[in-house]
Structure formats: C-alpha cells, structure tokens
Amino acid sequence: MTTQLEQLRKLTTVVADTGDIEAIAKYTPEDATTNPSLILKAAQIAEYAPLIDASIEYAKAQSNDKAQQVQDTCDMLAVSIGKEILKVVPGRISTEIDACLSYDTEGSIAKARQLIKMYNEAGITNDRILIKLASTWEGIRAAEVLEKEGINCNLTLLFSFAQARACAEAGVFLISPFVGRIMDWYKAKEGRDFEPSEDPGVISVAGIYNYYKEHGYKTVVMGASFRNIGEILELAGCDRLTISPNLLQELEDATGEVVEKLIDTNGNKECPAAMTHAEFLWDHNQDPMAVEKLAEGIRNFAVDQGKLEEMIAAKL
C-alpha cells in the first residue's frame, strides 16, 4: 500500500513547516512556511552562515545606524532563506513580518512592501511569495490593502471563528488556523487527551473550512500547528496543510488508508455583511482560548525575533 503521505497529497496540498532546506528537499512539498521561530532555528544551521554574512554586508551598505542594520539584516536573512527554499519547492514561500507590528496596520503594510521589494530585487516574483501577518484586526486590515496591490497574504495565529470570518471578508489569499495550539489549551484546561475526531483544533478548522465553502469564499484554508498525524488525517481534504518535518516523516512511514474528511460543497449561500471592528472584537473576545493563544503567539514570536536580533547585533 502507498504511504499515508502519498495518499494525503492526492487530497490536499502538502506544505512543509520549516526553514530547513534539507528537510524540505527530502519531502518535496508544494510550498513552505516560515515564522520568526523557524528563522531563528534555521539561522543556527551551519550551512546558513554565508547567508547571515551576506545579509550583514547588505545591511551595512544600507545604513550606518546599528539598530537599522539589525532590522535590515533580519529582513534580508528571511528573504535569503526564502529564496533558497524556493529553489526546492515549486510553489510559494511564506515569510512573516515582525510580530511587534501585529497591532500596527501602516507599519505592517510598510514592512510587507519592503520584504516584497527585496524578493523582487532577488528575482522572485510576487506569485511565489506569501506575506505572513498575525490575524489581529490591524493585521487583517493591512492584508486587505496588500491584496489589492497584488501582494498575497497568509494570515496566521488564527484561533477564533471571528478571525476566520474577518479574513474571508477582507479577501485575504490564505489563512493558517492553528490546530495543535487550540488542542493544547483545552488539554491544559480539561486535563485530558482528545481523540483526533473530537480534537477541538480539528473541529475548529473543519468548521471554518465548511463555512468558507458553503458561502463561496475564495480564501484558502491551510491547517497548521499539528501535534500528531491523527489531527492531520482528520483534516484530509483541506485546501492545504502545513506540516513539520517530523510529522511528514511519520506520514511517510505509515501505510494505513487515508480517507477524505473535508469536502468542498461549492455552496453559494448569501454572505453576511462584513463585520465591523466592534463586532470582530466582541465575537473574538467571546472565545477565551482564542484571546489567550493569539496574545501568547504574538509574544512568543516577538521573543524569538528578539533573540535573532541579539544574535545579529553580536555579529555586526
């Protein structure tokens, strides 16, 4: 029998959730996603040392201000890693903007434009890039502007239905609802494990997927943040799934049957009026898990961004 990874590929676009080019080349995904934590991890791989050195040289040529040099080095490093990854994936790379801009619409737009400019100057066209933004109201508004400029966005740290609905209404290209982190919260709260079919993260993503398809929204649903292959298999049929190398290996080693769980209904239900800012905040706030996990996710990405900046500053 074929492997579960091979079977899954027939139902879902498989994406690698890593900045490790060797791992990406091994599993031949369509796309790859990175985030500040993964860039920090990748920056510690010996093979990437020349990319760091080249990024520092670039930054020094742009400015004499050390703080600006650190920012420019981090941006160029993320783009350089993305460019290397694009040599081994046929599709897109997702590159995330600084988590410190999560509540700054104008700052997010400016940073996204800067990253796109750097990619374009490196010969990478917009159709191979997704700019990752946190699914805050401000991040969603930034994405709405960027999409109209032909800059496709990946809205991440998505935990609530309110976030998912607002993203679809803003016309964003893709969302990354987090499965495992939702399950983590409920596991800690209820003190028990969940079967994949009753996993709160799985149920959340399936609900978002079905809502999008019933209403004809074009936004791509890419399940993310998996803790085990059971969660992945319960979402077989989702538009895309971004999976870490260790779980890709588990799927490669397993041969049980993979059944399509999510099916596009091609619905045409009337879409509700777009949410107002007040409605978004109210609805999101009704979900304590989502409120806590969004804030925690932004803080954690900011911590890893800070560690990367410290590492770069020490080399300048």
From Swiss-Prot:
Subcellular location: Cytoplasm
Main function: Transaldolase is important for the balance of metabolites in the pentose-phosphate pathway.
Name by which UniProt lists this protein: Transaldolase
Listed pathway(s): Carbohydrate degradation; pentose phosphate pathway; D-glyceraldehyde 3-phosphate and beta-D-fructose 6-phosphate from D-ribose 5-phosphate and D-xylulose 5-phosphate (non-oxidative stage): step 2/3
Keywords attached to this entry: Cytoplasm, Pentose shunt, Schiff base, Transferase
Active site, renumbered: K132
GO molecular function, one term: transaldolase activity
Organism: Aliivibrio salmonicida (strain LFI1238)
Statement: the UniProt record of this protein carries the keyword Transferase: yes
Disulfide bonds: none
Protein family: Belongs to the transaldolase family. Type 1 subfamily.
Biological processes, Gene Ontology terms: carbohydrate metabolic process; pentose-phosphate shunt
EC number: 2.2.1.2
Catalysed reactions listed for this entry: D-sedoheptulose 7-phosphate + D-glyceraldehyde 3-phosphate = D-erythrose 4-phosphate + beta-D-fructose 6-phosphate
GO cellular component term of the entry, any: cytosol
